[in-house]
Regions:
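Generic cytosolic/nucleocytoplasmic N-terminal low-complexity/intrinsically disordered segments
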Residues: 1-2, 22-23, 27, 88
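Residues in flexible loops and secondary-structure boundaries
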Residues: 9-12, 22-25, 117, 140
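Bacterial lipoprotein signal-peptidase II cleavage site
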Residues: 15-32
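Mature extracytoplasmic or organellar-lumen-exposed domains after removal of signal/transit peptides
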Residues: 31-229
């Protein structure tokens, strides 16, 4: 995982050079300003476009699965609800490298209790996956989850609409992936994410898969610059 993070960081620096070059256009053809070739820029643009499609697909799947989760909760099947909870979340966790661009939707869908209370000084208004998680594991029942499940579905629908307008850049993808892998290695590994269900390993796997998707998209450009990476 460390090697993956280092590799992604190297491409992030390359993408940063591209952004810097575009902001420092000069008429002097001999300028020392670093910039990408048209071919490399096209590769970056293609990778960015494909990744956005990937995220849209993940959020589509998240919505479908969460609607089914809502039905399971409504039926009162506690065992099934606990079984599918971590599996459903994986689609969201694969998209987390660009969660920064989700804005308030990320807060509504994936905010942990400790973070919510830290910002709002109370639990009032707290919702999302982790609100349902606490009821399922701490109270060991599906009762009381229905309203949160309905709100969660609506919040994911809102996110789905938002994704279509989000500007995804190579810098956002790459720095987001590196930051996420670092978070997994230094913070999430303690179990802080799924504090009630202890299903963190599913999150780790999905986070790494999301970062690997970014790596795969940029791999041709990485190998072109340094085949040893």
């Amino acid at each position: 995982m460390k090697k993956l993070a280092v590799t992604l960081l190297s491409v992030a620096l390359l993408a940063g050079c591209a952004n810097t070059a575009s902001k420092n256009t000069t008429t002097n053809s001999s300028s020392s300003t670093v910039k990408l070739s048209k071919e490399d820029q096209k590769a970056l643009d293609q990778a960015t476009s494909e990744y956005k499609e990937f995220v849209q697909g993940q959020i589509d799947q998240l919505l479908k699965d969460t609607e089914e989760f809502q039905r399971v909760l409504k039926s009162g099947d506690l065992e099934e609800a606990k079984k599918v909870y971590p599996l459903i979340r994986m689609s969201y966790e694969r998209s987390e490298p660009i969660a920064e661009s989700f804005g308030e939707s990320d807060v509504k869908i994936d905010f942990r209790l400790v973070d919510y209370v830290d910002e709002n000084k109370s639990e009032e208004g707290w919702s999302g996956f982790h609100r349902i998680e606490r009821i399922l594991w701490e109270q060991n029942t599906t009762e009381g989850t229905e309203k949160y499940a309905e709100q969660l579905v609506n919040d994911i629908k809102e996110l789905k609409a938002k994704i279509a307008t989000v500007e995804v850049t190579p810098d956002l993808m790459l720095t987001g992936a590196v930051d996420l892998l670092n978070e997994v290695a230094t913070q999430k590994i303690t179990g802080e994410e799924e504090i009630f269900s202890h299903t963190d390993l599913y999150d780790f796997r999905a986070n790494i898969e999301g970062a690997e998707k970014i790596f795969a998209l940029f791999k041709p450009l990485i190998e072109k610059k340094d085949a040893k990476l």
